[in-house]
């Protein structure tokens, strides 16, 4: 299977998604847009598209960030959805999926940084690929915004600070506002790059300290993500 990663910043890690793909021997390709790497020309280049997070918004312009082309990424997402590829968006990536499908990004009720529980909705509890997450499940977070909802979208998980943590947009299309891919190394990269943001955010409701983030064990969350990815891949192969 061919997995393509779109990464927006050097400090945004593919984390547990990369380990999953490597451990299963899948073919991995990259668009590290911060380094000038191009997006795939079309959806024929991959079976699964994973679009990661970043400090940008789907509304960020080329003038504001020359290496981030929101329109081009949304076009690629639309191509992938039309071609019935697996599409997963994380944080900014989930917001790009919503925008690509016509649903505007919006501000989350709360800023969340660190690890906090998500709760499965009734749809999530019944979902064959999500129900094994259990409810509640503590996962990683680092965001201000949340994805828009199309008429066909289904919210599968929410948190106290954000009502759109996991959204299904189609049979093989999922947006994760939360970060189940976080590892100790991935979080450390964000911490090192975000000193001022963390200092400014301390005291807000859903902000962990640096010490708490460094000490938390991300393994259980990663394992539940890997099972979701395995089951999604199996379902896609049987379509």
Curated annotation (Swiss-Prot):
GO terms for molecular function: transferase activity. Keywords: Glutamine amidotransferase, Transferase. Residues 1-200 form the Glutamine amidotransferase type-1 domain. InterPro entries: ChyE-like, Class_I_gatase-like, GATASE. GO terms for cellular component: cytosol. Disulfide bonds: none annotated. The keyword Transferase applies. CDD domains: GATase1_1 (cd01741). It comes from the Bacteria. The keyword Ion transport does not apply. PANTHER family: GLUTAMINE AMIDOTRANSFERASE YLR126C-RELATED. NCBIfam families: PRK08250.1. This is Putative glutamine amidotransferase-like protein YfeJ.
């Amino acid at each position: 299977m061919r997995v393509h990663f779109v990464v927006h910043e050097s400090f945004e890690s593919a984390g547990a998604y990369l380990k999953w793909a490597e451990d299963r021997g899948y073919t991995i390709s990259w668009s590290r847009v911060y380094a000038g790497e191009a997006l795939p020309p079309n959806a024929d280049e991959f079976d699964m598209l994973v679009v990661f997070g970043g400090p940008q918004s789907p509304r960020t312009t080329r003038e504001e960030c020359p290496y981030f082309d929101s329109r081009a990424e949304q076009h690629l997402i639309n191509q992938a959805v039309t071609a019935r590829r697996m599409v997963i968006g994380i944080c900014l990536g989930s917001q790009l999926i919503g925008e690509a499908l016509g649903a505007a990004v919006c501000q989350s009720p709360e800023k969340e940084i660190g690890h906090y529980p998500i709760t499965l909705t009734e749809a999530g509890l019944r979902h064959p690929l999500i129900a094994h997450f259990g409810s509640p499940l503590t996962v990683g977070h680092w965001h201000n915004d949340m994805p828009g909802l199309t008429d066909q979208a289904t919210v599968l998980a929410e948190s106290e600070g954000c009502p759109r943590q996991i959204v299904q947009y189609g049979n093989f299309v999922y947006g994760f506002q939360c970060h189940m891919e976080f590892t100790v190394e991935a979080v450390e990269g964000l911490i090192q790059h975000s000193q001022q943001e963390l200092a400014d955010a301390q005291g807000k409701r859903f902000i962990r300290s640096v010490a708490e983030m460094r000490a938390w064990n991300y393994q259980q969350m990663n394992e539940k993500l890997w099972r979701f990815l395995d089951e999604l891949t199996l379902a896609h192969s049987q379509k």
